[in-house]
């Protein structure tokens, strides 16, 4: 069971585990004025890692085994495939021959799992916190599904921005599977960072990042998209409802060549059938273009004059206008 509690103008209580009337609950901030309470069956692990993050795995009554970082839900067994398939497959199916892929973040292994369904030759994954990988492999192994043992993986434990700043390699696709924009992670959602990523992309390639919920975190979403729009010649937004995120989640794409909604339908269906037929739980060619079909109010929101996320003025989670 999940209880949505709108608490305004009161200050939201601190997030985390709560014992209320003999019930173990998890309180999560879902926005600047919204919190959720979820029934907890069991706490599987809780660790303050060497990277300075609180990493928890919790068995939730509704969503099953779930990963929290700094009290924010990252993935659940119930619906992680919606997020990961939307992040990965529109991106890689837009490419004729995706040889090299870079994932920044992605320590839960879900994006890696989906990338490895494609005929890629090499995947570089740069994760800040090794403990995230170890925790998921131990407590939620269904998500990576053995992907960290794939010989095509080149795993780097380190700062994603520093890697991009010093990287001399080129990639067909760059997938930013990040924690939400708070703390040091805001540096991975700025115009300056996207400009550095752009230099790593081969001709014909593209970048994708999740860009927050389109309702509860509207301003954050707008500012991230604006930064991408001002960096790349081509840009697009997809959205998919992810129940555990309490919102329609946005995915922003940037390219100097082609973005997924511009992909020819015949090519899309052929590539899907050759690479992925029977291997997805959410994504299908029939919904590809629907993911990019935005209602009028969101199209209008993307045209509003908002400041792009920059190093000097980064977008942050739960930002308000």
Curated annotation (Swiss-Prot):
A Pfam family in this protein? Spermine_synth
Q: Matching SUPFAM superfamilies, A to Z?
A: S-adenosyl-L-methionine-dependent methyltransferases
Q: What is its EC number?
A: 2.5.1.16
Q: Which reaction does it catalyse?
A: S-adenosyl 3-(methylsulfanyl)propylamine + putrescine = S-methyl-5'-thioadenosine + spermidine + H(+)
Pathway where it operates: Amine and polyamine biosynthesis; spermidine biosynthesis; spermidine from putrescine: step 1/1
Q: Which sites are catalytic?
A: 177 (proton acceptor)
Q: Which GO terms describe its cellular component?
A: cytoplasm
Task: Summarize where spermidine binds, as residue positions.
Answer: 84, 108
EC class:
transferase
Quaternary structure, from the entry: Homodimer or homotetramer.
Q: PANTHER family given for it?
A: THERMOSPERMINE SYNTHASE ACAULIS5 (PTHR43317:SF1)
What is this protein's name? Answer: Polyamine aminopropyltransferase
> Which species does the entry assign this protein to?
Korarchaeum cryptofilum (strain OPF8)
């Amino acid at each position: 069971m999940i209880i949505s509690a709108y608490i305004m103008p009161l200050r939201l209580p601190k997030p985390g585990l709560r014992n209320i009337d003999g019930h173990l609950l998890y309180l999560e901030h879902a926005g600047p004025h919204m919190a959720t309470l979820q029934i907890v069956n069991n706490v599987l692990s809780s660790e303050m890692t060497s990277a300075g993050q609180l990493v928890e795995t919790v068995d939730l009554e509704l969503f099953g085994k779930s990963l929290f970082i700094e009290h924010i839900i990252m993935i659940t067994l119930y619906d992680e495939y919606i997020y990961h398939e939307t992040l990965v497959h529109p991106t890689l199916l837009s490419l004729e021959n995706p040889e090299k892929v870079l994932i920044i973040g992605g320590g839960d292994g879900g994006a890696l799992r989906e990338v490895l369904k494609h005929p890629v030759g090499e995947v570089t994954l740069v994760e800040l916190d090794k403990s995230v990988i170890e925790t998921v492999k131990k407590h939620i192994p269904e998500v990576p599904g053995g992907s960290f043992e794939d010989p095509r993986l080149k795993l780097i434990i380190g700062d994603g921005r520093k890697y991009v700043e010093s990287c001399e390699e080129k990639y067909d696709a760059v997938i930013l599977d990040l924690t939400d924009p708070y703390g040091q992670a805001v540096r991975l959602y700025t115009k300056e960072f996207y400009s550095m990523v752009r230099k790593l992309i081969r001709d014909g390639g593209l970048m994708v990042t999740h860009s927050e919920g389109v309702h509860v975190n509207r301003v954050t979403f707008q500012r991230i998209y604006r930064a991408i729009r001002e960096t790349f010649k081509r840009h697009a937004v997809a959205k998919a409802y992810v129940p555990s995120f309490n919102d329609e989640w946005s995915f922003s794409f940037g390219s100097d060549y082609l973005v997924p909604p511009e992909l020819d339908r015949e090519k899309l269906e052929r590539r899907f059938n050759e690479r992925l037929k029977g291997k997805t739980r959410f994504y299908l060619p029939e919904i590809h273009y629907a993911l990019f079909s935005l209602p009028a109010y969101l199209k209008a929101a993307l045209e509003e004059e908002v400041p792009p996320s920059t190093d000097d003025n980064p977008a942050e989670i739960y930002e308000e206008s």
